[in-house]
């Protein structure tokens, strides 16, 4: 029957003899992680930063790195909170190799080690080591990559700002575009711009532009989130494979466009994985330069449909037929638009004759200007965008673009919902970049650990039940 006295029994001060290992569930995530991680390389890498025969005894550097891994694996917002969680969590203590009574290293010790003692490139090395572990286990398929960017809210008050005049940033492809434009202008008999060799001028003509700068964290950028919402942020431009393994990341200020930061992350991934065949991106990357660069590298860019932004009741650009032999367009009424000039931004201009257009019955729907002239502009690298449009309509193109939601978008969703990447407490581009890389390293490590755990369990299942079923396939783990 019911015994109320048993319910009131207080066992909180009972003395129990038990080892920490027995208290951690056999399928706990940290057990899975511990099975796949190796730390010898970390001791070897960090040994020059510690003195063996002088000074006070230091904290084990691997313990400090494990504390940061715990923070990112379980989405704990800060190191201070991580320290509190480890104090009372038996599994966390087990992962660090500590008993129930051992004192946990102070969070300031961890922070100081990463800021002052450890080498700045340690986060990149940890990320690369974990990614190599996935490659060695043949878990990564770099033949197709997915690139996108996500914003991370900065630790900066959006009301504490100032306006600054900064030089326009030169584009990566500026020199190549300038050469091609100069050659084309010479063929057209046009003057080559005198400022082409001015190193102080950007691709849009040089000069400066006004920029909103945070007084708290000057490295972040003002990101326009919606019609009325603005905030300081960073952006993590990320590349992953079809399984969701992060292959590379480049962190920039939040006001840097996707296409401007694309070259850094693309070069980073393709240098590490030359076997990349398909590159899938969203509309923010649909530019002539990106299409040209990917296609010239014998890779296939997969980009989405973008809606035409002109007037609905006017002739569309595709209503005009291009003749490569004469380098001209023909309008729906059969009249010619001649190539007149090419701007230094790479825009070709085709113009019709005002004498013909003046009396044309289609003038109202043609889109001609007030002087009765129809002007059509295309980019000097338009042929690459046209090929991208063709690839988009193929079955393979539709299939790969649909995979974005379960690959790169899933990476961002998990990073923000499960691993606390929605906002950062760090300030400065270098510290935020290291923070993002460690977070992605933890996500890759989690995937490796779970996959290997599931594979070993499945192999055990096969070994037990194979004698009873001759048709059971053999799994090599």
Place the predicted regions along the sequence by residue.
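Short, contiguous pre-domain boundary segments
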Residues: 13-17
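Short, Lys/Arg-enriched N-terminal segments with co-localized hydrophobic residues
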Residues: 1-3
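Anion-binding and metal-coordination hotspots
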Residues: 6-7, 75-88, 100-477
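A short, ordered amphipathic alpha-helix with a cationic face
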Residues: 7-10, 56-58, 98-100
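A general alpha-helix detector
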Residues: 19, 63-69, 109, 113, ...
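N-terminal, Lys/Arg-enriched amphipathic/low-complexity engagement segments
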Residues: 21-24
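Short amphipathic alpha-helical interface patches used for protein-protein assembly/oligomerization
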Residues: 92-96
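Basic, short loop/linker segments at the boundary and entry of helix-turn-helix/winged-helix-like folds
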Residues: 26-69, 74-75, 379
């Amino acid at each position: 029957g019911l015994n109320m006295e048993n319910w009131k029994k207080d066992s909180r001060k009972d003395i129990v003899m038990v080892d920490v290992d027995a208290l951690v569930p056999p399928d706990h995530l940290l057990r899975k992680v511990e099975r796949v991680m190796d730390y010898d390389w970390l001791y070897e890498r960090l040994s020059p930063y510690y003195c063996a025969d002088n000074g006070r005894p230091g904290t084990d550097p691997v313990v400090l790195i494990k504390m940061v891994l715990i923070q990112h694996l379980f989405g704990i917002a800060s190191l201070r909170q991580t320290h509190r969680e480890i104090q009372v969590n038996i599994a966390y203590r087990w992962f660090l190799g500590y008993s129930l009574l051992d004192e946990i290293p102070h969070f300031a010790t961890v922070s100081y080690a990463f800021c002052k003692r450890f080498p700045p490139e340690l986060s990149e090395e940890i990320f690369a080591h974990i990614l190599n572990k996935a490659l060695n286990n043949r878990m990564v398929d770099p033949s197709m990559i997915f690139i996108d960017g996500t914003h991370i809210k900065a630790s900066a008050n959006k009301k504490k700002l100032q306006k600054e005049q900064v030089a326009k940033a030169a584009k990566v492809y500026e020199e190549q575009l300038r050469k091609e434009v100069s050659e084309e202008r010479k063929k057209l008999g046009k003057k080559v711009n005198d400022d082409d060799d001015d190193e102080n001028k950007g691709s849009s003509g040089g000069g400066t532009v006004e920029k909103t700068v945070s007084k708290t964290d000057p490295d972040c950028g003002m990101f326009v989130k919606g019609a009325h919402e603005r905030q300081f942020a960073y952006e993590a431009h990320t590349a992953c494979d079809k399984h969701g393994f992060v292959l590379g990341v480049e962190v920039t200020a939040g006001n840097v466009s996707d296409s401007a930061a694309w070259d850094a992350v693309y070069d980073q991934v393709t240098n590490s994985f030359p076997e990349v065949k398909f590159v899938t991106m969203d509309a923010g990357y649909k530019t002539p330069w990106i299409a040209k660069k990917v296609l010239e590298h014998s890779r296939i860019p997969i980009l989405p449909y973008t809606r035409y932004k002109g007037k609905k009741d006017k002739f569309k650009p595709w209503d005009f037929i291009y003749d490569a032999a004469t380098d001209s367009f023909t309008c729906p009424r059969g009249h010619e638009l001649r190539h007149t000039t090419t701007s230094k931004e790479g825009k070709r201009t085709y113009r019709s004759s005002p004498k013909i257009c003046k009396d044309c019955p289609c003038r109202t729907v043609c889109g001609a200007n007030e002087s009765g002239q129809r002007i059509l502009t295309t980019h000097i690298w338009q042929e690459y965008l046209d090929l991208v449009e063709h690839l988009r309509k193929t079955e393979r193109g539709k299939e790969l673009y649909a995979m974005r939601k379960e690959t790169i978008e899933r990476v961002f969703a998990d990073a923000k919902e499960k691993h606390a990447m929605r906002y950062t407490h760090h300030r400065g581009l270098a510290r935020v970049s290291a923070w993002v890389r460690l977070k992605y390293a933890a996500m890759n490590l989690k995937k490796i650990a779970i996959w290997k755990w599931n594979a070993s369990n499945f192999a055990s299942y096969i070994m037990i039940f194979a004698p009873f079923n001759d048709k059971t396939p053999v799994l090599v783990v």
